[in-house]
């Protein structure tokens, strides 16, 4: 073998071997235990970033480890290829989204191969191909027939100048990102899938997911937002309809002093006919899109509609206000307000001088002080007529029962979760397979017209979707009648909700899934991706699995047994202030830094001499220009070094700080491994190891080898603390580097140790391990080698360390056989120079001996 470690030479050779041998291609095999290891599929943006590299390295380490345990391991990869960025890039580069996307896929595929990930490339799929989305379209038509799909109008961002719908991220400060026109809210018909029909199951089955992070399960629980409460109907004077509200706090009902409705509510619209102030307010609300997250912090505004509702229990008239914090799409679009016991209602009532009536006593039984804020804690009722003196639960039930008996209340379970709106008014997505006949009938596209193919050879003007701009595209005939196709496309979360199942049978032509293959591989054993997908993707992913189960395609309830959310990758960030006060972010690669004695950055400048402000470590991002290109790092150090650093620098689920000094450290370690194998093999063949003829030192070294195997196995397999596994291997390597290699048995022991080290490192650094395994004459390819097993006998300690004290002060530490008697330990202690010195000429009055641990000689 060559003396120097040259990753640029070995890595491409090993990758070619894997390609030619199709090493990682698998098929169903009932005789073997399966393991399905899946990383979230990437969006083909053009280049891999470090976040991808971290995600996929973790997946590859787990997959390779499980393979070495003898399992049938599926690790597939594909491309989440539809989506808005492709449209923007196509307009910018004067091309169409399809060629841009396919070019990116080709480029990124090479990058993935360059990193040595062991994927089954025969299963690669791109979600923008008709071969893939045809089954999604077919499935949608089936869901429609089952009554799980419906159409209703829903508000979107509308640019009146471009006459087009904008995604939320295309609205900048209330204006269109392209033409700066003020964006309006417009109601348009859209398609929805009834995820709410599965709300209870999605909620309850979270309890089955023992190996999902609690944070993710909590986020999903809150997102589904199940609550138990009462729906209450109010009569409204001089208004044709009643108003219905939902509350989870009927115990506070006697303190309800006003109602609030959404600006889009029919009652507000009616009142606005004769109220210009209200009309202007409704207009303002219509054009400010409020994300639910912003609701809490925004200023609460409202206008009195002039209508009065009648409190069903007290008969009092209470005002009805239109307010910007009530959303039409949530609940009934109307809420009851109890300002004494809800902080938002309190702030609104204080601002507009509305009545604040306390009905719950403070914890000490006194009337609450509402001069500064509402009392939101539950407690005992007062000021509530017949319900005075009841605690929260009793009051909840008594008031709910009374309202029900009167016919104006109904107990209800409510969900925050809304049905999934899957319509997008974009081009680069899968066409929604619905048609409208000449007579207005809406129906699914017939099977013989599926897939509805998205034309790829299009011209993008950046304004209107090409399939909306071309009236001919939509024309078709159904049942002999002219019909128009739907020109909206699916939300791209549709494609990523079932791709994991299609990987099990990517070539299957008879339907969406081949149940036999799907049920062999599913559920996924471990799913790896970012926590930012906790609610949207991971909820739709679970929902789709249940839909496919109910269609008879899969027989499990949940798609993935374990979820691992990897931490973000951080890097140093620097900027200088430009002439106009703007921040110009400078890549850490271009920053020349000075550090203090602790290695902290104290000064920085760039090549042009700008003084740089160092803002610390932050997530690698385009906006801060602090991304590090993985390709540059692989070209500089090799893929194995980058992979090793990624797994060593931090626990998988914590943030990782990118430090090139750490990358250099990982590289030095691999050079040491190479050097040790080189020096070992240069001495020729090795005799067989005779474990019964080892010296004490050899036994001790062999014990370290097998203890390391046991620790690394536990760290990777059970604990998934990959960084501590690598640390243990590094510690063993330090011992091996110092071990004698003079005798035949020394070299035989070194051979056993190196074969173990190379196999333990293989999941992390597969190229160097593949090569060194061959140099060590390991059996077959390392890709088919079994994981090393710790020898229990070798790990048994036959000696132990005893601390020797004289009058309670430590004077020596001695190694004695495990079965040594107290006499033998005393005799051995007496041979130590320091112990002998303190025993000279004195009498030992007392001996305290803790077997195998401590010998304390009390002298006087």
Curated annotation (Swiss-Prot):
Its EC number is 6.1.1.4. Pfam families: Anticodon_1, tRNA-synt_1, tRNA-synt_1_2, tRNA-synt_1g. Keywords: Aminoacyl-tRNA synthetase, ATP-binding, Cytoplasm, Ligase, Nucleotide-binding, Protein biosynthesis. GO terms for biological process: leucyl-tRNA aminoacylation. A motif ('KMSKS' region) lies at residues 619-623. CDD domains: Anticodon_Ia_Leu_BEm, LeuRS_core. ATP binds at residue 622. GO terms for molecular function: aminoacyl-tRNA deacylase activity; ATP binding; leucine-tRNA ligase activity. PROSITE patterns: AA_TRNA_LIGASE_I. GO terms for cellular component: cytosol. It is an enzyme of class 6 (ligase). A motif ('HIGH' region) lies at residues 42-52. InterPro entries: aa-tRNA-synth_I_CS, aa-tRNA-synth_Ia, Leu-tRNA-ligase, Leu_tRNA-synth_edit, M/V/L/I-tRNA-synth_anticd-bd, Methionyl/Leucyl_tRNA_Synth, Rossmann-like_a/b/a_fold, tRNAsynth_Ia_anticodon-bd. It catalyses: tRNA(Leu) + L-leucine + ATP = L-leucyl-tRNA(Leu) + AMP + diphosphate. It is found in: Cytoplasm. Gene3D superfamilies: 2.20.28.290, 3.10.20.590, HUPs (3.40.50.620), Isoleucyl-tRNA Synthetase, Domain 1 (1.10.730.10). It comes from the Bacteria. Belongs to the class-I aminoacyl-tRNA synthetase family. PANTHER family: LEUCINE--TRNA LIGASE, MITOCHONDRIAL, LEUCYL-TRNA SYNTHETASE. NCBIfam families: leuS_bact (TIGR00396). This is Leucine--tRNA ligase. The gene is leuS.
């Amino acid at each position: 073998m060559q003396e120097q470690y040259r990753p640029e030479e070995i890595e491409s050779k090993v990758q070619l071997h894997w390609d030619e041998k199709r090493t990682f291609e698998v098929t169903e095999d009932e005789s073997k235990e399966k393991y399905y290891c899946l990383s979230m599929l990437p969006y083909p943006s053009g280049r891999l970033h470090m976040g991808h590299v971290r995600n996929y390295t973790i997946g590859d380490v787990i997959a390779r480890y499980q393979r070495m345990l003898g399992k049938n391991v599926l690790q597939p990869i594909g491309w989440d290829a539809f989506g808005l960025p492709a449209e923007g890039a196509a307009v910018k580069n004067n091309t169409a989204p399809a060629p841009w996307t396919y070019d990116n896929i080709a480029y990124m595929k090479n990058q993935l191969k360059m990193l040595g990930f062991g994927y089954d490339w025969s299963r690669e799929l791109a979600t923008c191909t008709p071969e893939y989305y045809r089954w999604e379209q077919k499935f949608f038509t089936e869901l429609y027939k089952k009554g799980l799909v419906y159409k209703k109008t829903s508000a979107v961002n509308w640019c009146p100048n471009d006459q087009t719908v904008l995604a939320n991220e295309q609205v900048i400060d209330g204006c269109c990102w392209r033409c700066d026109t003020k964006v309006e809210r417009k109601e348009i018909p859209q398609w929805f899938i009834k995820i709410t029909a599965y709300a209870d199951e999605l909620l309850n089955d979270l309890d089955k997911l023992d190996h999902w992070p609690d944070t993710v399960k909590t986020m999903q629980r809150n997102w589904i937002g199940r609550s138990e409460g009462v729906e209450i109907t109010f009569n409204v004077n001089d208004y044709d309809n009643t108003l219905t509200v939902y509350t989870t706090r009927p115990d506070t009902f006697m303190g309800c002093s006003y109602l609030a409705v959404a600006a889009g509510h029919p009652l507000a619209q009616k009142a606005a006919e004769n109220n210009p102030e209200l009309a202007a307010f409704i207009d303002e609300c219509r054009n400010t899109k409020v994300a639910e997250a912003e609701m809490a912090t925004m200023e609460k505004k409202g206008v009195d509609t002039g209508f009065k509702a009648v409190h069903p229990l007290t008969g009092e008239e209470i005002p009805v206000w239109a307010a910007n914090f009530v959303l039409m799409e949530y609940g009934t679009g109307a809420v009851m307000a109890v300002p004494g016991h809800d902080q938002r209602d309190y702030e609104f009532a204080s601002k507009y001088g509305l009545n604040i009536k306390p009905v719950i006593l403070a914890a000490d039984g006194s009337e609450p002080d509402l001069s500064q804020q509402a009392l939101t804690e539950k407690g005992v009722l007062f000021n509530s007529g017949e319900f005075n003196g009841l605690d929260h639960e009793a009051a909840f039930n008594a008031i709910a029962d009374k309202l029900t008996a009167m016919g104006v209340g109904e107990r209800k379970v409510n969900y925050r979760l809304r049905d999934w709106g899957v319509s997008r008014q974009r081009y680069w997505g899968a066409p929604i397979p619905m048609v409208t006949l000449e007579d207005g009938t809406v129906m699914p596209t017939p099977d013989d017209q599926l897939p509805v193919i998205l034309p790829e050879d299009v011209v993008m003007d950046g304004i209107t979707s090409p399939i909306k701009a071309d009236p001919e595209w939509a024309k078709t005939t159904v049942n002999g009648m002219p019909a128009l196709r739907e020109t909206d496309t699916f939300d791209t979360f549709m494609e990523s909700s079932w791709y994991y199942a299609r990987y099990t049978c990517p070539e299957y032509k008879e339907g969406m899934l081949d149940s036999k293959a799907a049920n062999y591989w599913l559920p996924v054993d471990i799913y790896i991706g970012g926590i930012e997908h906790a609610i949207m993707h991971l909820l739709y992913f679970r929902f789709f699995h249940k839909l496919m189960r109910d269609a008879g395609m899969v027989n499990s309830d949940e798609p993935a047994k374990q979820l691992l959310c990897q931490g973000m990758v951080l890097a140093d960030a620097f900027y200088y202030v430009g002439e106009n006060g703007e921040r110009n972010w400078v890549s850490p690669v271009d920053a020349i830094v000075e550090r203090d004695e602790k290695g902290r950055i104290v000064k920085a400048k760039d090549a042009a001499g700008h003084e740089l402000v160092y803002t610390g470590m932050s997530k690698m991002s385009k906006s801060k220009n602090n991304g590090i290109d993985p390709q540059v790092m692989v070209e500089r150090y090799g893929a194995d070094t980058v992979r090793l650093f990624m797994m060593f620098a931090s626990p998988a689920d914590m943030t990782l700080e990118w430090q090139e000094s750490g990358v250099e450290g990982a590289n030095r370690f691999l050079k040491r491994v190479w050097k040790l194998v080189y020096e070992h093999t240069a001495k020729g063949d090795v005799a067989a190891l005779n474990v019964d003829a080892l010296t004490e030192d050899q036994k001790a070294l062999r014990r370290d080898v097998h203890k390391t195997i046991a620790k690394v196995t536990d760290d990777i397999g059970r604990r998934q603390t990959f960084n501590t596994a690598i640390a243990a291997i590094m510690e063993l390597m330090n011992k091996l580097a110092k071990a004698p290699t003079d005798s035949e048995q020394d070299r035989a022991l070194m051979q056993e140790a190196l074969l173990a080290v190379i196999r333990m490192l293989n999941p992390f650094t597969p190229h160097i391990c593949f090569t060194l395994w061959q140099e060590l004459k390991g059996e077959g390819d390392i890709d088919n080698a079994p994981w090393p097993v710790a020898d229990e006998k070798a790990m048994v300690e036959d000696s132990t360390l005893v601390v020797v004290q004289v009058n309670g002060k430590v004077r020596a530490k001695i190694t004695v056989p495990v079965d040594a008697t107290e006499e033998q330990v005393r005799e051995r202690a007496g041979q130590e120079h320091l112990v002998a010195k303190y025993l000279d000429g004195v009498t030992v009055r007392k001996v305290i001996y803790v077997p195998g641990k401590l010998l304390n000689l009390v002298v006087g």
